[in-house]
Amino acid sequence: MKFYLLLTAALLLTAVIIEAAPTDHQDEARDLMREERDDKSNCPISHPNYCSFTPVCCKHECLSNNKCSSSEFIPGQ
């Protein structure tokens, strides 16, 4: 009987560990986000465009003079 209890506990623990580990799909999605953002800024995903002239993280693309094209920005790092 102890054998079956230990076996059950081991299977449950294995299931929990497997469930908690990130999947390959999650790793691929994370890598794609990094590839899309090739700048070295620490801008969040909500404001992904780093405009270096004013150092801000802009929600929309930067203008040709590297300034934010909208008023939706946060301080860059």
Curated annotation (Swiss-Prot):
Keywords: Disulfide bond, Knottin, Neurotoxin, Secreted, Signal, Toxin
Cystine residue pairs: 43-58, 51-62, 57-68
A GO CC term assigned to this protein in UniProt: extracellular region
GO MF term set: ion channel inhibitor activity; toxin activity
InterPro entries: Conotoxin
Tissues/organs with expression: Expressed by the venom duct.
Record propeptide residues: 21-36
Subcellular location: Secreted
Annotated signal sequence range: 1-20
Keyword Secreted (UniProt): yes
Keyword Secreted annotated: yes
Domain statement: The presence of a 'disulfide through disulfide knot' structurally defines this protein as a knottin.
Protein name (record): Conotoxin Cl6.12
Species in which this protein is naturally found: Californiconus californicus
